[in-house]
Amino acid sequence: MNTYEYKHFTRNLNILSRDKLTLRKMVTSKWLVRLTRHCSSWSIAQRQTQRTQTWVSQQTYAEYQQSLPIILDKGLTDFSFSPELCDRLRKFTAYNVGSGKQIRGLLTMAACEALMQPEQKKELREKMFVLAWGAEMLHAFFLVTDDMEDGAKTRHGQTCWHLLPDVGKYAVTDTGMFRSFVSEILRIYFGKEAIYPKLVDIFNETYFKTHIGQFIDSTFCSNRQYLSFTQEKYALVSALKTSFYTFQFPVLLGLALNNKYSDKAYKLVESIGSDVGLLLQMKNDYLDLYGDEIVEGKTGTDIQEGKCSLPAVIAVRLANGYQKKIFLENYGRWEDKCVDQIRNLYNDLQIQKICIKEETQLYNSICQRINNLSKDSIPPGHLFTKLVNEIYNLKNINYDVKP
């Protein structure tokens, strides 16, 4: 999709929001296939992922991209009585799903393939795509709700869903409806299979734990007790808000699809997954502060929102009395001068260098734990190694600062 095609697509969205009849005519499977096949052009980050991802083969990646409209069509079969409902879900999906780096979808496929027997790959391929898109759809649900709560303006290089002219307050209904739609897709594809209850449990646990993480994160922001930020609190938020649904969730889906889910496997995924999620959260926090907004496709607002982020935790740990006073007076405020004060404080404390150092130390620690796994562990050590390395190298951070 080139620049002209993207502008044409955006213009069509505005037209379609006003003209439901036009929408029913234009949103066809063929159109959606073309859209999803080229969704990498929606953001620089997604283009980088398509070019450089090594989670799965390029053929698998292409088939995965093309499977979304088929999954949507099947999922909407029982809702043909309401074209408006179908149109709204298609539009929400087209705008919010698949335009990022697709970490969770790719991770789900990588986990599924690593656990499959060779003779199962053809049989389970479609189901693997369904679970991968289910993970991405769940991610989209959380991003849209998070953007509403945070007052974010852009996501993946485009205006946030809740700020679109024809959305506004209806974004709450849209997200609730979309979450239920994900459950409907699971029922349609897996409802008659033995693994269905386990898949439902995994999705429900992911929703619940992530919401708890978001609640705790919001509580930390709202009470403004910034000097109480500690590494322990930071790790707790990360484990619930990021670790489970980013890393553990996709791997558990792979285990369930391949009938290898067990309490022992769950505990191993939880143990290593907590640290991997923490690694990803540290990377996200770094990029919120030091990343390129154009490349990342979103505005960084952790300082303004008063988030319990890695830079904030380090600052509280290292600051002297005077610096803590500056931190308390300016952190969690939206005025430009306050944000600048915090950035200057971070520079004085060399936060950028310390973030890089701590991220590297955690990565090395995770690798050592994986190397110590037994050869017959489930999931296997090579799966953890592949996923950790992909996550660690996911963002092309310009490390001009020496660790």
Which sequence ranges carry the predicted segments?
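Surface-exposed helix-capping loop/turn segments at secondary-structure junctions
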Residues: 192-193, 322, 370-380
